[in-house]
């Protein structure tokens, strides 16, 4: 199961991911973010680390890890002591993926990033990271379910042979062939500010 120490900096390497939506970037040392209805202004090293952590950031430094702990307590950073793709999978599955619908200059997406955004933007229901991995692993086209008004057919497709209890799909997708490439595509979308975590 996913896990890891949250505040124990004596264990060594810590990996973090930013939570919340970047609203305004004045500089690398002053930003305004929104998370769960609240607005936060981060300054100095806190702002710098939050920006670095948008697509994952790993550190051994005691000073950085102290800042990690402070940002975690504020609810704007998630962290794990597993600095690998499994750790990133655990961080992503313990949060909600949200689409950044703010206007601005956006470059077109290709390949897997485009497919993930189609699922998340056009879907009739919210999808978890493990559900996205399942859909990509099974090469399910987002357009097939366009007329599925409430996402019932999609849910049946995902959970057709599974009991939807105790994170069964999350545990199953830990060993999925497409887990790492899907996680990496999601991290790129986070870095491009197309997605954010809650």
Model-identified regions with their sequence ranges:
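Short, amphipathic alpha-helical interface elements at domain boundaries
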Residues: 3-54
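Long, charge-rich, low-complexity alpha-helical segments
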Residues: 38-198
């Amino acid at each position: 199961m996913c896990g890891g120490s949250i505040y124990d900096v004596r264990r060594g390497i810590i990996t973090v991911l930013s939570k919340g939506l970047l609203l305004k970037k004045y500089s690398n040392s002053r930003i305004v973010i929104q998370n769960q209805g609240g607005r936060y202004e981060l300054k100095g090293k806190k702002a710098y680390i939050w920006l670095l952590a948008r697509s994952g950031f790993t550190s051994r430094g005691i000073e950085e890890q102290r800042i990690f702990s402070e940002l975690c307590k504020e609810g704007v950073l998630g962290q794990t002591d597993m600095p690998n793709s499994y750790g990133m999978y655990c961080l992503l599955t313990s949060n909600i993926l949200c689409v950044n619908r703010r206007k601005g200059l956006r470059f077109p997406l290709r390949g897997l990033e485009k497919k993930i955004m189609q699922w998340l933007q056009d879907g009739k229901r919210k999808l978890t990271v493990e559900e996205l991995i399942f859909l990509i692993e099974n090469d399910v086209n987002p357009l097939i379910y366009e007329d599925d008004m409430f996402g019932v057919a999609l849910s049946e497709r995902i959970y057709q042979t599974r009991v939807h209890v105790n994170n069964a799909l999350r545990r199953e997708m830990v060993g999925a062939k497409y887990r790492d490439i899907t996680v990496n595509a999601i991290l790129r979308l986070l870095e491009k500010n197309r997605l954010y975590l809650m």
